[in-house]
Swiss-Prot record:
UniProt protein name: Cytochrome c oxidase subunit 3
Gene3D superfamilies tied to this protein: 1.10.287.70, Cytochrome c oxidase, subunit III, four-helix bundle (1.20.120.80)
GO biological process, one term: respiratory chain complex IV assembly
Keywords: Membrane, Mitochondrion, Mitochondrion inner membrane, Translocase, Transmembrane, Transmembrane helix
Family: Belongs to the cytochrome c oxidase subunit 3 family.
GO cellular component annotations of the record: mitochondrial inner membrane; respiratory chain complex IV
Top-level division of the source organism's lineage: Eukaryota
Complexes and interactors: Component of the cytochrome c oxidase (complex IV, CIV), a multisubunit enzyme composed of 14 subunits. The complex is composed of a catalytic core of 3 subunits MT-CO1, MT-CO2 and MT-CO3, encoded in the mitochondrial DNA, and 11 supernumerary subunits COX4I, COX5A, COX5B, COX6A, COX6B, COX6C, COX7A, COX7B, COX7C, COX8 and NDUFA4, which are encoded in the nuclear genome.
KW Transmembrane helix (keyword) present: yes
CDD domains: Cyt_c_Oxidase_III
Mitochondrial intermembrane-facing ranges: 35-40, 106-128, 184-190, 257-261
Organism this protein belongs to: Ourebia ourebi
Length: 261
């Protein structure tokens, strides 16, 4: 490390990949225990260790990038490629869910009554809460772009305001989605309609929670003056992720809520 003559970051040995893998094992085992034996002990242990791992791992990355200067332009380029590939992998995840939905809805089987939505299913009105959710996410896309432009112009206060608005809209979306699930006239066990609806929208909702967490971390980092107009990849990655979540929701709204109803 002392005599390094290249622009790459040679990472020091870290325990977090190991603790992260163990926490993932605990979480998946805990889910099975919860589903089959109604015991949440293992799941809670897995979630706790996962949160602790993420906190400490991200803390180390922030130290390396912001305070130690290890994230050179070459390293940032690699991180950009990594984030792009990660988002592409997420696109493929959602492609699978849309495939399942269209496979079931374009050629409904006789067991479903030969129609879509299946006989006995009362779909949600796309012009009520789903339309409000769409407006909320589109507004958050505008505010995150405002935050990015403010950062590039060196306007710290506007950046913080825009970021706070984006986080608030993300939390509002999650609350609206939770209320919609609570009041839905069908469940995940109501045949293929219930399973495709809840898996696709639930997976998207999980991504909104992850994206909101990402933005909250960026908000606190900006409070501590971590970002500059030419060194802010953490925020840029969060913004990319948030726009991805926006676009996926538009496809979900048009496919499942509007056309599918």
């Amino acid at each position: 490390m002392t005599h390094q003559t290249h622009a790459y970051h040679m990472v020091n040995p870290s325990p977090w990949p190991l603790t992260g893998a163990l926490s993932a094992l605990l979480m998946t085992s805990g889910l099975i225990m919860w589903f089959h034996f109604n015991s949440t002990t293992l799941l809670m242990l897995g979630l706790t260790t996962n949160m602790l791992t993420m906190y400490q791992w991200w803390r180390d990355v922030i130290r390396e990038s912001t305070f130690q200067g290890h994230h050179t332009p070459t390293v940032q380029k690699g991180l950009r490629y990594g984030m792009i590939l990660f988002i592409i992998s997420e696109v493929l995840f959602f492609t699978g869910f849309f495939w399942a939905f269209y496979h079931s809805s374009l050629a409904p089987t006789p067991e479903l009554g030969g129609c879509w939505p299946p006989t006995g299913i009362h779909p949600l009105n796309p012009l009520e809460v789903p339309l409000l959710n769409t407006s909320v996410l589109l507004a958050s896309g505008v505010s995150i772009t405002w935050a990015h432009h403010s950062l590039m112009e060196g306007n710290r206060n506007h950046m913080l305001q825009a970021l706070f608005i984006t986080i608030a809209l993300g939390v509002y979306f999650t609350l609206l989605q939770a209320s919609e699930y609570y009041e839905a006239p069908f469940t995940i066990s109501d045949g293929v309609y219930g399973s495709t609806f809840f898996v696709a929208t639930g997976f998207h909702g999980l991504h909104v929670i992850i994206g909101s967490t990402f933005l909250i971390v960026c908000f606190f980092r900006q409070l501590k003056f971590h970002f500059t107009s030419n060194h802010h990849f953490g925020f840029e990655a969060a913004a990319w992720y948030w726009h991805f979540v926006d676009v996926v929701w538009l496809f979900l709204y048009v496919s499942i809520y509007w056309w599918g109803s």
